[in-house]
């Protein structure tokens, strides 16, 4: 029997899992600074709920089946639709505006390739109950600071640059209506969203199947506008006149300028996201040189929550989603030797080398002291005792074990050290060994914490 994972699904070894969890922690730290509240929703939902606003492409990719009770269920393809259902279900318990964060796995039957899997992790963030441009700008600022935290602070030795492309569905729909193509808007939006994926020529071919050539040329000309933000806005105003959606985009840009982060944003009318529930601002983010597609995408959805219940009035929402596994793939592509452990405080790792069978109990008592020396638990040191079987293990094998787990400090206690209430501490990054008391050992390990790196 060939033992392997399903196509598009993968195992994560400890090193891979370490990178993933630190990406999650970096994103969480940014969202926490904005007061987003963490929630969770089921992986399985009723199919009719998930498919309400999914679009034809998504419907083809969804994992859908009958459960043992004969119910038509599907695995979530994103975290946005389940969140809208969550709001509709729990509206009486929520204080609006509600800031939500959530991370978890989602499932899509896509063509699997690097950066595109059938099971992958997302970290979402949304604000519901807020329909002003400030909400849009707040979400876009989260995207900026989240990517900055990951790519400019998390990774040592590289300075990854990124750009956040954004558009507005209202601007595009206004133009389609001007062309007399209002009823074709969803068809057009789904196709122009593919321009960067399959090229403008193939998109043009698809549009010509249902739309006259003159209109197609006008659409492709609009979404290909070049120049500065001001140039594009002036061009749009000359075409659409006094337009509410254009004003919205201007207000968002002014807010981003207030934060002095506007240079990382690009008004790009090719962005439409291809999902039927978006109604306003939409965005995608690109890491230069990665060729991985968007690492954080999203937009405004004003009608999604109310579509789940007739008793709920319109509740506006806007949000985005970080692609954790795609971000990890970009990190994997980089040629660097170390990844800094940043989170809140890097935890030092210690291995107590098993030297003497007569000191087994003492080793475990010592490990407990390392783990619990700080009452607040914030500055404790992760530590383990090497398991010694009946055949024993020599010191070389124990050191190799420490290196394989990227443990930095080895602690040696033989009979002589035990009698003196001392220990030898070896720093594997410096190849130095010192005879120290327990408190001195703690100080040595903690003082080196700021420089702690995990070799890969």
From Swiss-Prot:
Summary of subunit composition and partner proteins: Homodimer.
Pfam families according to UniProt: HGTP_anticodon, tRNA-synt_His
Family: Belongs to the class-II aminoacyl-tRNA synthetase family.
Predominant localisation class: cytoplasm
Enzyme Commission code: 6.1.1.21
Keyword Transit peptide: no
UniProt superkingdom: Bacteria
The protein's enzyme class: ligase
Source organism (scientific name): Borreliella burgdorferi (strain ATCC 35210 / DSM 4680 / CIP 102532 / B31)
Descriptive protein name: Histidine--tRNA ligase
A GO BP annotation: histidyl-tRNA aminoacylation
Keyword tags: Aminoacyl-tRNA synthetase, ATP-binding, Cytoplasm, Ligase, Nucleotide-binding, Protein biosynthesis
UniProt GO cellular component terms: cytoplasm
Catalytic activity: tRNA(His) + L-histidine + ATP = L-histidyl-tRNA(His) + AMP + diphosphate + H(+)
Stored CDD domains: HisRS-like_core (cd00773), HisRS_anticodon (cd00859)
Source species taxonomy: Bacteria, Pseudomonadati, Spirochaetota, Spirochaetia, Spirochaetales
Molecular function as annotated in GO: ATP binding; histidine-tRNA ligase activity
Family annotation (InterPro entries): aa-tRNA-synth_II, aa-tRNA-synth_II/BPL/LPL, Anticodon-bd, Anticodon-bd_dom_sf, His-tRNA-ligase, HisRS-like_core, HisRS/HisZ, HisRS_anticodon
UniProt subcellular location: Cytoplasm
